[in-house]
Every structure is written in structure tokens, then in C-alpha cells.
Amino acid sequence: MSIIEDARHGIVTEEMKQVAKAEGVTEDFIRRSVAEGHIVIPVSPYRKVKICGIGEGLRTKVNASIGTSTDIVNIPEEIEKAKQAERAGADTLMELSTGGDFADIRRQIIANTTLSVGSVPLYQAFIEAVKKDGAVIHMKEDDLFRITAEQAKLGTNFMAIHTGINWETVKRLRNQGRHAGLVSRGGAFMTAWMLHNEKENPLYSEFDYLMEIMKEHEVTLSMGNGMRAGAIHDATDRAGIQELLINAELADKAHAKGIQVIVEGPGHVPIDEIATNVQLMKRVTNNKPFYMLGPIVTDIAPGYDDRVSAIGAAISSSLGADFICYVTPAEHLALPTPEEVYEGVISSRIAAHVGDMVKLKKVREADLEMGHARRDLDWERQFAVAMNPARARKIREERMPADTDGCTMCGDFCAIKIVNRYFKF
């Protein structure tokens, strides 16, 4: 039985127990939420991973995407990115290589992380078609499903599958137009394939077969967002909403079959439209775990998109998004370095925590502890509570004051020291 089927039969699995303990909730809450599809726990029969629950009532989780490109194929560096992401506190990884030996890269990444790993089988299928026949439009449907099964057998825990792109979605995209076109590689590949071959998306038309693969290998299905906006002026448009409606219907179908499902959301959304997107997605998907790709809230800050994304992610999380994909400072500019991966994860973890302070009041306890540590000028406690203790310690030690109780910001005029002479808080 799948983990959903166990939950439906009243069985609390070891994975459910681990999530309950980590999140400070009851085992029965986890079991019921998994059964209802409100929480997923990505697992695999092929490898043991650090168990992670994603969904309602749990801490917002952060994904870090890594992988080669056609210009840069450096497997040791990708392994280092995986390690940096895990050190920075990422909850999951997505391995999204588009250059090199896909199976070898994924195998090495999986061997060098304890985190759940996701993939996009569509990338490999289309890129192999380019290598073999010269263009993505020559991708064979059988190859797409074969690659999906092969990636599952490597121990992939969850997969982004672009099921929501069909003729209705493409028609709405064409009728409406866009300022920035399509920015999803999977969305662009599949749309081009459909238009050239005059055929329906096989991930949509053969969804029953896809579900067989997902079920057999216990892969969590992440409903891909191939029509997501690549500019804030394209946010919340008809093509994106059409894809969401299709994904929502297919997500219900997969859940009924005992397959865990996540639904992906948009990537570029102005702040005043975030609430609309989160509420709409949660409503039409029957409260399935919602995976927000950022979002980017302004398009004019390349080089700082980790911060731009953190603004959107904090708001999304506070409104109910369950899972956010990090963004690095290199977004829209280049393949990120390991250092940029680390920075991206930290930025997203801060955003997730800020959001969780709204929907999970208990996470504010860490902020309360930091407040007390600062009141007491207890630097070691401050470092221990900090999101990135090493960085906090480094900055202080590089600029250590003469009076080691305070810091070089205020020096002799430390407000806390002055008031502490008269008050005991």
C-alpha cells in the first residue's frame, strides 16, 4: 500500500511519526492530513531520506533547485551545491540538469544528499530528442514515460509533471497574448511539441498511465506550472488559471488513486495579487500542498532576486503557501555558484520563518529567545538562535568592541546597558 492508503486504513507509519515529532503535532493529525491529501511526505522505496512533511499545519518548507546547463557541466560543483543547500537548511532538492549524462548526474547528487530529491522528467526527454533527432519537437511519447520510470527507480522522491498544458491552455495563451511569453522550459518545450505535431500533451492524454508509474514507484506528483508568468504584468492571467483548473482536477484524480500530490503555483506575482493566487489555488485544489515558486514581486532587481523572492515568499507563506522554491542572486542572469545556492536557501528560510510567524504562532518562540538574549547581552545565545550562526559570529568578531558586552554600532552609548542599570526586565 502507498502511504496515503496506509493513512486511510488508520495506519500511522514511521514516516508519519517522524513528521509529527519534528513538527510538534499529533500523529493522528498527520495521518488524517495525509489521508485527506492536505499533507504529503515524499518517500521512495529505493532510498532512505531525511523525512519531510509538506502541507497544512506544518512549517513552510524550502526547496533548492540545482543542476547543470548546456554551457556548464561540472558535476563536482553540482554536488557541492547539493551539500551547500543542505548545510544552509533546505528541506528538499530538485535536480534539474539540462547538460551532461543525466542519469549519472542524478545518481551522484542522490548519493551525496540525505534530502528528498525532485526532478522534471520532461527536460531529459526533450533534450535527448534534441541530441538524437535535432529538435524538441521530435520527442517520442514512449521515451517520456520510459524516462519518468527510470528517474523514479533512481530514488527520485517527487516529480514536477506538466500535465496542465493541453489544447485549452494553449488556446487561451494564444488568444490572450503575453508581455514576456513563456519562461517555463517544460511549458515551452511541450507547447512547441504540441503545435508542431498537432497532438495533445501525452502527460494529459495518458494521465492514467502516468499515475501507474507514480503509484508503482511511490513518487509524489508535483503538478507542474508550465504556464506560469515570467513577468509580473503577466501574473494571474487566463492561461495560468486554465492550467491551474486542469491541474486541480487531475490532482484529485491522482489522490483518489493513492498518489501524493503537490500543486505548483506562479513565479512572478505583484504583492497585491499574492493573496488572490494563494486563496484561489487552495480553494480549487481542495487544500492540497501549495508550492510557490518564489514569487518574484518586481522584475527590475536582477542580482538581488533572492531578496525580491523572499519578500513574496514571506507573504505567500503567511497566507497559506506550504512549500517555496528558493531563488538565488544569479536568477535571470547565470547558473548559480555553490555560494549563491547557500545564500538563496538562507533568504528563503528567513521568508518561510516570517510567514510561519503568522500561521504558526509557536515559531515566534525563537524570536522571543533572541529578544531576551539581546536584552541580556548574551552573545553566545544570540549566535545559537540565529538563522546563520557562523555569519553572525564572523561579523561581530571582525569588528569586536573594546567593551565586549556591547558592539561597535553603539559603543559606549549602548541603550541596553544604560537602561539595564535602572530596570530589571
Swiss-Prot record:
Catalysed reactions, semicolon-separated: 5-amino-1-(5-phospho-beta-D-ribosyl)imidazole + S-adenosyl-L-methionine = 4-amino-2-methyl-5-(phosphooxymethyl)pyrimidine + CO + 5'-deoxyadenosine + formate + L-methionine + 3 H(+)
Cofactor binding note of this UniProt entry: Binds 1 [4Fe-4S] cluster per subunit. The cluster is coordinated with 3 cysteines and an exchangeable S-adenosyl-L-methionine.
Residues in coiled coil: none
Enzyme Commission number: 4.1.99.17
Residues annotated for substrate binding in this entry: M94, Y123, H162, S184, R185, G186, N225, G226, M227, R228, E264, Y291
Chain residues that bind Zn(2+): H268, H332
Primary enzyme class: lyase
Highest taxon listed in the record's lineage: Archaea
GO terms of biological process kind: thiamine biosynthetic process; thiamine diphosphate biosynthetic process
Keyword Repressor recorded: no
Record GO terms (molecular function): 4 iron, 4 sulfur cluster binding; carbon-carbon lyase activity; zinc ion binding
Disulfides per UniProt: none
Pathway: Cofactor biosynthesis; thiamine diphosphate biosynthesis
InterPro entries in alphabetical order: ThiC, ThiC/Bza_core_dom, ThiC/BzaA/B
Requisite cofactors: [4Fe-4S] cluster
Family stated for the protein in its record: Belongs to the ThiC family.
Function according to Swiss-Prot or TrEMBL: Catalyzes the synthesis of the hydroxymethylpyrimidine phosphate (HMP-P) moiety of thiamine from aminoimidazole ribotide (AIR) in a radical S-adenosyl-L-methionine (SAM)-dependent reaction.
Family annotation (HAMAP family): ThiC (MF_00089)
Protein name: Phosphomethylpyrimidine synthase
Organism annotation: Methanoregula boonei (strain DSM 21154 / JCM 14090 / 6A8)
